[in-house]
Structures are given as C-alpha cells and as structure tokens.
C-alpha cells in the first residue's frame, strides 16, 4: 500500500503541476493579445488641438486615416467644410469629413509605422509621415524629408 500511496501523490502532483503550466501559458497568451490590441494603431484618434478625429484603418498592407469628425464641420456659408486650401483647384470641393489625410503607412515592426504621407487640409500640403503607438497616444510625425529630421511631432489621443 505505501507504494501506491506515493504513486498517487506523484500523479496528483504532476496533474497540479501541468495545470499550473497550462494556466500560465493561457494567462500569457491572453495578456499578449490584450497588449497587442492596446498597441494597435487601428481606431479613432483625436488630434492634439481637439479640432478633428481621424479613423485609422488597414487596407491591405497599408494603414490610412480619414477624418470622421470636425469641431467645425461647416464652412461659414453653412455647407459642409471643404478642402479649400488644396493646391489642385479641382479638389477644393471635396468635403473634409471622409477625406483621407493619412495614406500608405507601413507597419515597421512593434508599434511603429512609416513610409507614408500626411495631408494637412489647413495649408493644403502633404508631408512624409511616421507614427508610433504609445499606449493611448499616437505620436504622429510629419516631415519634409523621408528620414523625419525636418518636421514636427503631434500627439493624438485614442477615442474610446
């Protein structure tokens, strides 16, 4: 009998040990998924000045962003705000809501995106763009050069 008692204890210990391992693996997997979702660039982001919300979405390998909300959605004449500063006169009738202002960004690894462009409807200019997700903040860098040396960084904030 003492032999079977030790065997049963060993089996019980092994079962509990295996359960702990499975629990640890499942916990790590769930944590990893939660962290990756929290670090995802996809979603809605409010600009640092609070004047607009941009929805970032994935299309194939590219990440793009369109304006989905404006603090001032209408022009002074009461019509929907338009792309009045666009250098191409034909595009000045485009409505700002729905306008893509981020385009062609590629996932560079981790929480970084780059090699894209950002359009500023305020001045009608397009700049090189890179982004980095830091929790609920999206650090967006627009620059004159592809390396991002000559430019500025804006912090956008995730909208729940």
Label every PLM stretch briefly.
Residues 1-40:
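Bacterial Sec-dependent N-terminal signal peptides
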């Amino acid at each position: 009998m003492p032999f079977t008692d030790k065997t049963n204890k060993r089996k019980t210990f092994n079962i509990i040990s295996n359960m702990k391992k499975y629990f640890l693996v499942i916990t790590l997997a769930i944590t990893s998924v939660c962290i990756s979702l929290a670090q995802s660039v996809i979603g809605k982001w409010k600009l640092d000045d609070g004047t607009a919300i941009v929805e970032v979405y994935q299309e194939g390998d590219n990440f793009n962003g369109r304006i989905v909300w404006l603090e001032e959605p209408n022009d002074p004449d009461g019509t929907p705000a338009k792309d009045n500063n666009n250098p191409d006169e034909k595009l000045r009738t485009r409505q700002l809501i729905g306008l893509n202002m981020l385009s062609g960004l590629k996932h560079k690894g981790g929480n970084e995106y780059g090699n894209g462009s950002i359009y500023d409807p305020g001045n009608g200019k397009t700049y090189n763009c890179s982004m980095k997700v830091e929790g609920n903040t999206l650090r967006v860098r627009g620059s004159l050069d592809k390396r991002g040396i000559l430019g500025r960084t804006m912090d956008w904030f995730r909208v729940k």
